Amino acid sequence: MAEGGGEARSGRARGRGREWGGGGRGGGRGRGGGYGGGARAPPPPHLAPAALARQGAEGAGGLAGGSPVRASFRVNARNATEGYCPVPELPADVLVRGPARQNRAVHGDVVALHLDPPTEWPAETLGGRGGQLGPPGPPPPSLSGLSLEEAAGGGGATELQRWGRHAEARGLRPTGRVVAVLEPSPRRACMVGFLERGPVGGGALELAPLDARLPRCRVLPRRGSGPHLPAAPSGTLVVSASLEAWRPEDRLPDARVTGVLGDARQMGVQARAILHQEGLSATHPPDFPADALACLPPSGLWEPSEADLAGRRDLRPWRVFSIDPPTARDLDDALSFERLAPGRLRVGVHIADVSHFVGEGTALDAEASRRSTSVYLVGEVLPMLPRRLCEQLCSLQPGEPRLAFSVVWEVDEATGDIRDEWMGRSVIRSCGQLHYAHAQHVIELPPGRAAELPEGAELAPDSPHSRRDVAEDIRALHGVAHKLRARRFAEGSLRLNNPKLSFRCDPHGHPLEAAVYVQREANELVEEFMLLANRRVAAVIAEACPGLAVLRNHPPPDRRKTAEVEALVARMGLPGTFCTSSSGAFQESLRRLADSAPLEVSSAVTLLSTKPMHLAQYFCTGSEAFAGNKALWRHYALAFDRYTHFTSPIRRYPDVLVHRTLAGVLGPDGRPRPRSSPAPAPEALARVEACCKHSNEQKLAARNAQDGSLRLNLSWLLKDRPMDVPAIVVGAGGNKWFDVFVHELGVEARVLIEDMVGVRAWFRDGALGLTAAGSPPNDKPGQPRRKVKDNPYGYAVDGALLPLELRLLSPLRVRLYGREVDSGRRVDVAARLLSAP
């Protein structure tokens, strides 16, 4: 889902776009296939910083004169000879084709990119836009630290925009070549792969990365206390490694093995590999450093002291309760409600005051900043904070006094309008830990029936509040949340409700059953108040501390990609117009589609709508790129001018920074002090900027690890228990494969044509055709028939299905199963074609 929904607690984006056309993977695993060209000439050395700065300062000819631009480098996982660099002013990612032009750049590097003249750009081909698209924003800074305009003699940005319009008008794909690596990718230090004997060079050891976007490497000899490596690796041994060097004359880079993870055929080894390749094994070790633990209060039962309570508003008499999943132990948010007078309500959001325990500049603060986020895997959590803080001292446990940061509103019951607001540090005592199911029970009670909590919903034993009162609070809060939600969507919020895979696990965390997590009105109740608190806090800190506030922005999606979704829905002939011109129009289009199309189809369109979306990012309002352009502060999906993260400090470090900022700008009355606008100290600004950058990287790594954990567990579950399910076609790779989306589990899976015994395929005009092998070819005369190889996964397709023509959003029925990949060394989710309507 885009961050119009899960931003309040733990939203996550999904997947990459796949389009019709394109080919399969090129060059096998890794990228060690030589430099191309008749002479196989190696690429030139990278330009030195002085040369880059000189080109930027002296490039009077602008881009045409050779001035490079700064860009991130991404590799196509299905064809590693294709690299892509997003440049905001250009309508499509810049294609960097072939090892020589990629010039030893690694997926995730920030590079200096030389753009070819537009006269050399090729025409776009069907499916040729497979590169990762980066977020739009300010012009990329030049290599000398100047702006693009300055680096290109005043004409760089204008020239880029002119080139971009030229490419868009003529349907061209920009191309370029890497001339230097400016910032090495973090993935260089956390590679994971199979240890193999190379075919050349005396059979030297080589690393075959699990991530096909990374290059195959030559393994350096063991050094010092490094791990012992087997003389004859089995081919299933998984190791971690770091890329040490890649010289221009070398076909393969050098890597040094840093650890041995084990046999890839074991599920636990695959799980560890996921963490290693995201760098989370380094940032989230099982144990916290001793100096960080020494910052905690002495062990034993903790009660707030008089010093702890000084300056806090005492809200312990208030009726406060939390609503969470039944498995939650880190309770960092709670709600309160009180009816002040007819039509006047008081609603409170109370957040664990983590910043009280995590002092700025302490060893614990450094460790929390390094981890930056909790990582949620199937059956396991890698916490940001020590468990004593997560689950005890900070967790808003019922019946216990807890330190909090509260936001309290007086609300008009009829309209949901906020009449008054207070923010500040507090002390609360929750009266109950409720589950979403408990709140949902109350919400679903008939309006005329007295509110009551269901069985199993217990309050703290010494709570002075009644079950009836808490149930009435839930009912009233639901009414306010409903008004807030309706207004938010009326003002343009967008929610991409992609189904979320979840598991029922045994007491040891092993998955027993997979299903889609169902979000209901109780979830939305909590979500609305968390969104409101985040929004209001963002407005306060952005106004009172404009130089150092940590906010969260979300750039608009790639317009060309959303236009493709519009065209796709139009071709389906569904009623109504599908419009993506704004977040509000997008939301209304999805709502109409959900009302008129089958669930699986509307869900697949929502998935395809997610793919053009960019990730939301933390940023500092004083950063050069943002300070002068507040339009960039906006959150597209939520349609908020200001937004931040305040409500989950137990598991997100930026929330801790926001708490500290808010505490610094509030007066004793809970209102912001008069704005002071001195420029922040350069050192302070640099620290906050670095924290935002690291938090963005860690959030993405945690999301990737969570997705990897979900898919890994599902693949092993399906290996023993395949599932027959409805599916929708969402992508294809020529006549080699097609991808399907399964709404029942919220997953994509690939169907390989080569598995279909006696079936041949053709691809033409955006359609994939399947016919019996004996049928006459329907595309080009004389095209050879596909040879059927020995295939343990081969199966016969029901002849009554053939011939079959598939397009995007074609409905099917498939069998999901766990397929061994990498020569039987790993398991992944795959699908077989069963039937079509």
Regions found by a protein language model. Give the residues of each.
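Charge-lined substrate channels and their catalytic hotspots, especially those that engage the 3′ end
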Residues: 2-351, 355-401, 433, 450-454, ...
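Electropositive polyanion-binding surfaces
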Residues: 225, 235, 245-249, 263, ...
